[in-house]
């Protein structure tokens, strides 16, 4: 994908941050305009995260202009907002490949650029890492500076506050920038507040502030008066008391789209000692009206025509598994007022929009707080309700102790609806749902189900919802269902699989939605095909029957082979001293990079052709 860089004459001068810092300051507003247009041009042609980057253009330019990156270390939280950062740090001509197989990584990635200090993808990690990096820089003694950029959503997570509490204790020299795009620029973000921010961040004020503390430290009444006077002045326009109490010097809020004002404030703050906190207000989707009006829809986009202002509509074909879940949720809630649904900031992605509108008093979005979500569900279960935690596989990892300690040990009936299980595609290593079967299978009392199609998914959700002897989990993939008929809901027998096809020497034991591919292989090789359904408890009787009547077994799953469902089958056979050969097909022992689901399954041998080739090579 090529771009006519002549349309962006100022941006064309910037292939690195060193070149950026050679530009006269007066040219930076023009650079910001061109950078925003370039981002629109590139993402609309290739797809990617969009609205967040539009909102951080001025901040990105200002940070790289003021700080000596990559010597100074700039850390982005999550990374959705880092496309302008990639464009300014030598990757401008490759931005059209982002999120594609072999292209730029969707998030800041250490292996991609020296400018990407921390590999990210999950939220709220930046401040913790930043403290460690700042402490290391202090010990290095080369005056290397550390900056963390975190959004208003990510900063609500407990990990961010744990980190800030620690920073207030050990007081490293670092800057945390809060990119607050929750609302349009407030009344406080005007000339007075910007002037106050520059005044309070200036060297004169800081020197007087610290000097006064030392002089009057032995005179408590005067020291307390100075503290209260400062708080009163700042409190007239500053909502930063919480961050001050955590030990940060708080500045803001300031206009995050005033690049020259940001540069002045950042220059003032750059040499201040101790933990600093700059609160900026931005508009998500800034500069592209459709994204400003609907930043959720334009958060991540497919290819689209920017002149139309509309994203392409889906073809209206098969429903996604997320929609299957959402429809089941509404159907069940209408019949049972004990149902409570919980999501950690994934309402749209998890298919819960309709439920949140129909049953607002039974819908809980706990924000980016996976640990809290799970233990909150435990409390609801103790109170006699039926909680369902709708969560992506990759994010459930963040609440593992809560699943084990707060739910499973107490045998509480919490249902986990695990979306995005298996290969997710363009978001790459940080978002693949590769490990949930492995990390859940070892938990006592856990029931784990792997549907092979949307009808089975509904039946399993129903089964898990009515299972009262402990927690249960249903895992299903990103993407569309297969188009089978939906039958009336009924409970499945726990721990029982079903034979889908009878063959001869080989039996394929399938776990989950790779069933269509497994069926093609079974037909080609005249193999028996089993829908195992349950990863825990396993259908040991059926496994032993297959071992006794076949010369070899193959297990198929879209989870890490290590510790996954296939490993469970191996354990059953060894426990019963059955010397039947077993081939485990699943995700290999490395972090799977980005690419479409189809591309990655083909590369990993998880499509029908790949599975058949693996089996034939193994049998040869």
Swiss-Prot record:
**Could you tell me the keywords of this UniProt record?**
Isoprene biosynthesis, Magnesium, Metal-binding, Thiamine biosynthesis, Thiamine pyrophosphate, Transferase
Enzyme Commission no? 2.2.1.7
**GO CC terms on record?**
cytosol
CDD domains referenced in this protein's UniProt entry, alphabetically: TPP_DXS, TPP_PYR_DXS_TK_like
Which positions are annotated as binding Mg(2+)?
Answer: 152, 181
Q: Which InterPro entries match?
A: Dxylulose-5-P_synthase, THDP-binding, Transketo_C/PFOR_II, Transketolase-like_Pyr-bd, Transketolase_BS, Transketolase_C, Transketolase_CS
Q: Can the keyword Oxidoreductase be found in this entry's annotation?
A: no
Q: What pathway is this protein a component of?
A: Metabolic intermediate biosynthesis; 1-deoxy-D-xylulose 5-phosphate biosynthesis; 1-deoxy-D-xylulose 5-phosphate from D-glyceraldehyde 3-phosphate and pyruvate: step 1/1
Binding-site positions, thiamine diphosphate: 80, 121-123, 153-154, 181, 288, 370
Q: Which residues form the signal peptide?
A: none
Query: Can you tell me which family this protein belongs to?
Result: Belongs to the transketolase family. DXPS subfamily.
Q: What does this chain do?
A: Catalyzes the acyloin condensation reaction between C atoms 2 and 3 of pyruvate and glyceraldehyde 3-phosphate to yield 1-deoxy-D-xylulose-5-phosphate (DXP).
Q: What is this protein called?
A: 1-deoxy-D-xylulose-5-phosphate synthase
Q: Which organism is it from?
A: Shigella dysenteriae serotype 1 (strain Sd197)
């Amino acid at each position: 994908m090529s771009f006519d860089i002549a349309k962006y004459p100022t941006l064309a001068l910037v292939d690195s941050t060193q070149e950026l810092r050679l530009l006269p300051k007066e040219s930076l507003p023009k650079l910001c305009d061109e950078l925003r247009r370039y981002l629109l041009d590139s993402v609309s042609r290739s797809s990617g995260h969009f609205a967040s980057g539009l909102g951080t253009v001025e901040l990105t330019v200002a940070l790289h202009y003021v700080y000596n990156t990559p010597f100074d270390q700039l850390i982005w939280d999550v990374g959705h907002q880092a496309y302008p950062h990639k464009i300014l740090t030598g990757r401008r001509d490759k931005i059209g490949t982002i999120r594609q197989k072999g292209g730029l990584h969707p998030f800041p990635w250490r292996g991609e650029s020296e400018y990407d200090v921390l590999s990210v993808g999950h939220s709220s990690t930046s401040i913790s890492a930043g403290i460690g990096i700042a402490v290391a820089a202090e010990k290095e003694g080369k005056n290397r500076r550390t900056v963390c950029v975190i959004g208003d959503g990510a900063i609500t997570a407990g990990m961010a506050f744990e980190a800030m509490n620690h920073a207030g204790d050990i007081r490293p020299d670092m800057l945390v920038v809060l990119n607050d795009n929750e609302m349009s620029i407030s009344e406080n973000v005007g000339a007075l507040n910007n002037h106050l921010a520059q005044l309070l961040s200036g060297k004169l004020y800081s020197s007087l502030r610290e000097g006064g503390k030392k002089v009057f430290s032995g005179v408590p009444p005067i020291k307390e008066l100075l503290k209260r006077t400062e708080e009163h002045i700042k409190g007239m326009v500053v909502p930063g008391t919480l961050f001050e109490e955590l030990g940060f010097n708080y500045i803001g809020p300031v206009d995050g789209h005033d690049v020259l004002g940001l540069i002045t404030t950042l220059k003032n703050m750059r040499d201040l000692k101790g933990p600093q906190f700059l609160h900026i207000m931005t508009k998500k989707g800034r500069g592209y009206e459709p994204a400003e009006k609907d930043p959720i829809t334009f958060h991540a986009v497919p290819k689209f025509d920017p002149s139309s202002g509309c994203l392409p509509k889906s073809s209206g074909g098969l429903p996604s598994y997320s929609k299957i879940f959402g429809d089941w949720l509404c159907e069940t809630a209408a019949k049972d007022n004990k149902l409570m649904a919980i999501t950690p900031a994934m309402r749209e992605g998890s298919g819960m929009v309709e439920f949140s509108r129909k049953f607002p008093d039974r819908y809980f979005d706990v924000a980016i707080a996976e640990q809290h979500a799970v233990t909150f569900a435990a409390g609801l279960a103790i109170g006699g309700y039926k909680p369902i935690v709708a969560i992506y596989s990759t994010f459930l990892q963040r609440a593992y102790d809560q699943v084990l300690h707060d739910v499973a040990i107490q045998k509480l009936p919490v249902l986990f609806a695990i979306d995005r299980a298996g290969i997710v595609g363009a978001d790459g290593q940080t978002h693949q749902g590769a490990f949930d079967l492995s990390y859940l299978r070892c938990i006592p009392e856990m029931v784990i189900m792997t549907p092979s199609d949307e009808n089975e998914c509904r039946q399993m959700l129903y089964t898990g919802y009515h299972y009262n002897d402990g927690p249960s989990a249903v895992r299903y993939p990103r993407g569309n269902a297969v188009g089978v008929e939906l039958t009336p809901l009924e409970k499945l027998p726990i721990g029982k699989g079903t034979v889908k096809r009878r063959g001869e020497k080989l039996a394929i034991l399938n776990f989950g939605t790779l069933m269509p591919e497994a069926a093609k292989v079974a037909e080609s090789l005249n193999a028996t095909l089993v829908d195992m359904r349950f990863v825990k408890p396993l259908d040991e009787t059926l496994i032993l029957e297959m071992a006794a009547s076949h010369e070899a077994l193959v297990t198929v799953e879209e989870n890490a082979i290590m510790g996954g469902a296939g490993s469970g089958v191996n354990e059953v056979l060894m426990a019963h001293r059955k010397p039947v050969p077993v081939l485990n097909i699943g995700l290999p022992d490395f972090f799977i990079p980005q690419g479409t689901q189809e591309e990655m399954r083909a590369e990993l041998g998880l499509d029908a052709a790949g599975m058949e080739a693996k089996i034939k090579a193994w049998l040869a």
